[in-house]
Swiss-Prot record:
EC number: 3.6.1.26
Organism, scientific name: Escherichia coli (strain ATCC 8739 / DSM 1576 / NBRC 3972 / NCIMB 8545 / WDCM 00012 / Crooks)
Residue intervals passing through the bilayer: 4-24
Compartments reported by the entry: Cell inner membrane
Descriptive protein name: CDP-diacylglycerol pyrophosphatase
Keywords: Cell inner membrane, Cell membrane, Hydrolase, Lipid biosynthesis, Lipid metabolism, Membrane, Phospholipid biosynthesis, Phospholipid metabolism, Transmembrane, Transmembrane helix
Single biological process term from Gene Ontology: phospholipid biosynthetic process
Catalysed reactions, as listed in the record: a CDP-1,2-diacyl-sn-glycerol + H2O = a 1,2-diacyl-sn-glycero-3-phosphate + CMP + 2 H(+)
GO molecular function: CDP-diacylglycerol diphosphatase activity
Pathway field: Phospholipid metabolism; CDP-diacylglycerol degradation; phosphatidate from CDP-diacylglycerol: step 1/1
Principal location listed in the UniProt entry: membrane
Lipid bilayer topology: Single-pass membrane protein
Amino acid sequence: MKKAGLLFLVMIVIAVVAAGIGYWKLTGEESDTLRKIVLEECLPNQQQNQNPSPCAEVKPNAGYVVLKDLNGPLQYLLMPTYRINGTESPLLTDPSTPNFFWLAWQARDFMSKKYGQPVPDRAVSLAINSRTGRTQNHFHIHISCIRPDVREQLDNNLANISSRWLPLPGGLRGHEYLARRVTESELVQRSPFIMLAEEVPEAREHMGSYGLAMVRQSDNSFVLLATQRNLLTLNRASAEEIQDHQCEILR
């Protein structure tokens, strides 16, 4: 019993330390790198010179930019042209806020252009990390390849994913996930952030603790994936864990 209690105490200490490290990362100057690129470089260059550089695309009227990430050959980031920190922002559950997940899905074409040939939709994934699972304090959705093992697991669970948020059998990457099937028409009309906040009990009050991902299924529907921070299981809710920025799935 004493050993079990000691082990539990050690796990708590590790979890607290991990959370502290995550917080320390977010309070450093480097955590504003993406925001500075968007607000001080991409946006002014587009407005003054009609040149989105260093971004790949700047859409001021639509409220977003697309930037090639340095990590991986095909990874891009979709970010707002104004200040939104991350999943904890109440702006994301405001219907007047742009539907960033839908916009990010449209931006997957940048992967194909970079690759030199079409990247199949089944190979693409979108992900945003929770407040403790990210290293940057500017909202950004990762547009990148999906891990082959995650792709296989989602294919195998196609029949088990419904239009309600339910636990995904077996979870993903050792962490628990909720999964919800959505049609393209649903996705166009409603942001996944609003779906999560309105449909999962108590999610609205804890949006910053969630990471969210989206993948297309073989029946042309989409699956939304949500994981919530759980420091006791060392889950920082970094939904980016389902992605493979080296794109092995294309080889």
